Amino acid sequence: MLACLHKQEQYFLEKVDLINAVAKGIKQAEKLKINDLSINFVKANGLCTGGITTAIVHGIKLAGYKFDKYKNNEKFYLPNVTILGAPKEKVDKMRKKIQEAINDADGIILARDLVNEPSNVLYPETLAQRAVKAGKESGFEVEVFNEENIHQYQK
């Protein structure tokens, strides 16, 4: 598969263009049942190496999102992806950006899951429980307020 993002004379990318191009490629790979694929890293005007890396990871992780846990037991599609042609001097920075982007995408997926849950499953108490669980799993602190705490902050 080859994705051409812009005409050569318009070689200035927006991050969202790259995310969408990668996501389309991932969706096509899923249709074709391809589990291993490569993405050729191309430096573009307007995006730094970290921005390009982040966009690639977001496109990969978010393309396969579906909230269908009540419909079937289908697994989330996530192929093995290799990024080729990256500048050697930027590899360490890219590794760091890949992990950051994975964490970002996981947070986006969690938010999408929470928004898509029906109200008889996700009500204030269960939302608080899930927030605490996410905090423990990801290493951040969660403070759950009761109604009295909330009223104190409204003054």
What feature does the model see in each segment?
Residues 1-155:
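Short amphipathic alpha-helical segment within the helicase RecA-like ATPase core
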